[in-house]
Amino acid sequence: MTELARLKFYATQPHSCSYLPEEQATTLFLDPSQPMDVHVYADLSEMGFRRSGDHLYRPHCQNCNACVPARIPAARFIPNRQQRRILKRNADLTVTAARPAFKEEYFELYRRYIETRHADGDMYPPSRDQFSTFLVRDLPFCWFYEFRLEGRLMAVAVCDLLPNGLSAVYTFYEPDEERRSLGRFAILWQITEALRQNLEAVYLGYWIKNCKKMNYKTQYRPIELLINQRWVTLN
């Protein structure tokens, strides 16, 4: 483990929670002057930290522990019948790794996705500046995985390639292709990619029991949840 005791962290003032509107949230950030070292990042991911733009963070709420870090142990994952159907349905897609960059093709897909699927969220309305600040970061471990159908961009999975796993930062996809379940397929593909690269896990971010938008995460079994500073398996 990295000497994490040397690192500095800062907590925000209480603010409205993005997931549970009736709650006040506090967020703990790694000192932004600390270089974004991949090994520090990997160690912090084991402790439930995530990346957004140039920042590593985790929830640090005084009276709530609803945000539970979740990861899929790649070698032990077994797809269920529905997931096997999703894999088969998307077997015609090709996946290519690209460096993070701003492209109108990316932004137009992102814009349609946010406007269709998340018009009630804090990422609406989408803008080019927001897209760039959130996702287009020049970090050596960050990759854009493009999912295409005969050249047409169907989805982009933004992932961080860490020594201990793939961290699923964000996925946006064609909202008109609902039958394909592209968001779920992107996770299934990332599990396969983690196995191919001999990585232990796919980090999914936070699972929140009372947030319907998070329910899909526990459909991947087994899944591991960080509870009381220990990763606990949910079969």
Swiss-Prot record:
GO biological process: ubiquitin-dependent protein catabolic process via the N-end rule pathway
Superkingdom as given in the UniProt entry: Bacteria
Catalysed reaction equations from the record: N-terminal L-glutamyl-[protein] + L-leucyl-tRNA(Leu) = N-terminal L-leucyl-L-glutamyl-[protein] + tRNA(Leu) + H(+); N-terminal L-aspartyl-[protein] + L-leucyl-tRNA(Leu) = N-terminal L-leucyl-L-aspartyl-[protein] + tRNA(Leu) + H(+)
One Pfam family per UniProt: ATE_N
Keyword NADP: no
Enzyme class: transferase
Main localization (coarse): cytoplasm
Disulphide bond pairs: none
Compartment(s) where it occurs, according to its Swiss-Prot or TrEMBL record: Cytoplasm
Record has NAD as a keyword: no
Keywords (A to Z) from UniProt: Acyltransferase, Cytoplasm, Transferase
GO CC, alphabetical: cytoplasm
Enzyme Commission designation: 2.3.2.29
Ranges that cross the membrane: none
Family per record: Belongs to the R-transferase family. Bpt subfamily.
Role, per record: Functions in the N-end rule pathway of protein degradation where it conjugates Leu from its aminoacyl-tRNA to the N-termini of proteins containing an N-terminal aspartate or glutamate.
HAMAP family in UniProt: Bpt
Protein name: Aspartate/glutamate leucyltransferase
Species annotation: Pseudomonas putida (strain ATCC 47054 / DSM 6125 / CFBP 8728 / NCIMB 11950 / KT2440)
Gene: bpt
